[in-house]
Design a protein with these regions (language model features):
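Extreme N-terminal starter segment of soluble prokaryotic enzymes
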Residues: 1-3
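ATP-dependent small-molecule kinase phosphotransfer cores
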Residues: 35-87, 127
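ATP-dependent NMP and nucleoside kinases share a basic, alpha-helical "lid"
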Residues: 88-124
């Protein structure tokens, strides 16, 4: 039992790998589009707003981009809840970062055939070959900039992944076999790793609910979850807001206790 995230470039053609893994392992398959639709229903945002938050940095008029960060928190919470039961393949933007720190998460980077990507863009958009190449470069650059803005890391840094497969060199079937061999040997769920995922789901849910509450200045309050205990940290000026967060946290499934501490200014 494990979780697999597949990351790829725009028009990467990775869906076949995801479907192969889902069928051979008996895992559920969750796409970004399905996740965003469910997230929009749960948190009251539109899929377009959520997708924009997952693809683009804030514009010049958005300041620090707090609204986008709140939407990202909502997506993280929705994803964490959906993979809590394990046996899931997620195909979408930044899944390996949204679930970072979960030991039974296998983070796979799928490198697509460049010509396949170009052909896919040309077929869908009717771009010329040169325009399709330019478009892919722009999309990849935007994604890289987004990852650096949100997480402070390079999307292409190999240390952010556990495994890479190159579809220009191996078939979909072989890529699927490589991933299956890796996940079954090295990424099985333990009680300890499950608790880490449960805490991630709780913490991200609290942060998502905070961000949607206009009466809470969420950038001034820190939330941590460990072993089902939520700890809320705020300075003395924001204790009233911290009390609101405590009430939110108590309503979230899996929370055993809620504590509040005063953070140093």
């Amino acid at each position: 039992m494990a979780i697999i995230t597949l990351s790829r470039g725009t028009y990467g053609g990775v869906k076949q790998v995801a479907e192969c893994l889902s069928e051979r392992l008996g895992y559920g398959l969750l796409t970004r589009e399905e996740l965003l639709a469910a997230c929009a229903q749960e948190y009251g945002a539109t899929p377009t707003q959520l997708e924009s938050a997952l693809m683009q940095r804030p514009g010049l008029l958005e300041g620090r981009g707090l609204r986008r960060l709140r939407y990202i928190a909502c997506v993280q919470a929705a994803l964490a809840r959906r993979v809590q039961g394990d046996n899931m393949v997620y195909l979408g933007q930044a899944g390996h970062l949204l679930l970072k720190g979960v030991p039974h998460l296998l983070r796979v980077r799928v490198v697509a055939n460049v010509e396949h990507r170009i052909a896919a863009v040309m077929e869908k958009t009717e771009f010329t070959r040169d325009r399709a190449i330019q478009y892919l470069r722009e999309m990849d650059e935007e994604r890289d900039n987004w990852v650096r803005w949100v997480y402070g890391v390079d999307f292409n840094d190999p240390t952010n992944f556990d495994l890479a497969v190159n579809l220009a060199r191996v078939s979909v079937a072989r890529a699927c076999t490589i991933v299956i061999e890796t996940v079954t040997q090295d990424f099985q769920t333990t009680p300890e790793s499950q608790q880490i995922l449960d805490d991630l789901a709780i913490g991200s849910e609290v942060r998502a609910r905070m961000g949607l509450d206009q009466g809470i200045g969420d950038e001034r309050i820190t939330v941590e979850a460990k072993d089902g205990v939520v700890t809320i940290m705020a300075d003395t000026r924001h204790l009233a807001e911290a009390e609101k967060v405590k009430e939110l946290a108590r309503q979230i499934p899996g929370v055993r206790d809620v504590q509040a501490t005063t953070a140093a200014r």
